[in-house]
């Protein structure tokens, strides 16, 4: 692309004039380092704030930049996690004791699913490389694809069935699907008895609360017949992967919505098997690079809030 930068540019003139001149990497790094040292000497190490996004890469985002903040001595390091994935991280930890999904980006795993359900996840536009790979596997196997999204997204245009849910109705819909599956005894009882702790109490709770398709229809703006059909497809699929992402993570009840979808995957036996999972695409690896104690900076002030 003609717009791609291939070397550092330094502003000349006033800010906003949009005038820049190319400089070498050595000059750029030297000038930045000198300004950082000046700020640290004048205002303290806490004057430096670091913000890192996911596009820097997991190892850089959660590893090197976090490590640099500890070596520099600033507590003011933040990523996109609080508004991108904190809800699902907590949900994964509460449900399975680990903050990441339990399946892999492989054809033998994700390509084995008979049903792919994209729940608030527009992968075709937001993660085209991932989607292209997974969708190629899906088409190769001849698997079905359902998209649950208020908008007719690019991902939805590829689906066998698009369910235009009302924004915020995700947890109600998932609870109703679970209610139907339990009521019709469509759950994988053998899997539940072997691997799902507390599933009988969960079943009793769901049925007692009355989270029926009729109850959820008014919250999700989806017909009872559609809710029942969705439950049937998930329960009868020989391997179903439910993909969640920003549509779940950045809305109300994020943590509990993620947990309910994890429960849905669990009671249908879609956990820890090829082609079966709840896979939140905001997932990241837990990385904690260790730093020798004598190299850690002394952080004197608390993190800014």
Label the predicted regions.
Residues 1-184, 223:
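N-terminal export/assembly segments and adjacent metallocofactor-ligating motifs
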Residues 12-20, 201, 212-217:
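Short glycine/proline- and acidic residue-enriched helix-loop micro-motifs
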Residues 23, 27, 63, 168, ...:
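Conserved active-site and cofactor/substrate-binding residues in soluble primary-metabolism enzymes
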Residues 43-47, 187-192, 241, 272-279:
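Flexible, glycine/charged-enriched surface loops at secondary-structure junctions
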Residues 49-57, 218-222, 245-252, 284:
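Conserved short loop/turn motifs at secondary-structure junctions
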Residues 185-213:
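Internal, active-site/partner-interface "lid" segment
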Residues 217, 222-242:
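Non-catalytic, charge-rich alpha-helical accessory subdomains
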Residues 234-305:
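A glycine-rich, hydrophobic/aromatic-adjacent loop/helix-cap motif
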């Amino acid at each position: 692309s003609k717009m791609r930068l291939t070397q550092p540019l330094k502003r000349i003139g006033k800010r906003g004039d949009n005038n820049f001149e190319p400089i070498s990497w050595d000059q750029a790094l030297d000038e930045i380092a000198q300004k950082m040292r000046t700020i640290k000497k004048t205002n303290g190490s806490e004057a430096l704030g670091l913000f890192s996004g996911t596009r820097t890469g997991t190892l850089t985002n959660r590893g090197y930049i976090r490590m640099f903040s500890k070596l520099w001595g600033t507590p003011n390091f933040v990523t996109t996690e609080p508004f991108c994935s904190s809800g699902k991280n907590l949900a994964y930890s509460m449900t399975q004791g680990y903050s990441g999904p339990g399946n892999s980006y492989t054809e033998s795993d994700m390509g084995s699913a008979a049903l792919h359900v994209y729940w608030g996840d527009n992968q075709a536009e937001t993660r085209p490389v991932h989607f292209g790979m997974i969708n190629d596997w899906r088409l190769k196997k001849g698997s079905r694809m359902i998209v649950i999204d208020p908008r007719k997204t690019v991902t939805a245009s590829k689906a066998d069935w698009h369910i235009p849910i009302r924004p915020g109705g995700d947890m109600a819909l998932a609870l109703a699907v679970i209610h139907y599956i339990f009521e019709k005894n469509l759950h994988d009882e053998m899997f539940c008895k072997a691997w799902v702790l507390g599933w009988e109490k969960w079943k009793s709770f769901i049925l007692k609360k009355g989270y029926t398709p009729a109850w959820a229809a008014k919250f999700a703006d989806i017909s009872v017949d559609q809710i029942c059909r969705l439950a049937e497809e998930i329960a009868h699929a020989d391997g179903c992967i439910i993909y969640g992402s920003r549509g779940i993570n950045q809305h109300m009840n994020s943590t509990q919505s993620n947990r309910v979808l994890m429960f849905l995957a669990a009671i249908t036996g879609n956990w820890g098997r090829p082609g079966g999972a709840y896979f939140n695409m905001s997932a990241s690896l837990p990385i904690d690079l260790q730093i020798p104690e004598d190299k850690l900076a002394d952080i004197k002030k608390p993190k800014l809030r």
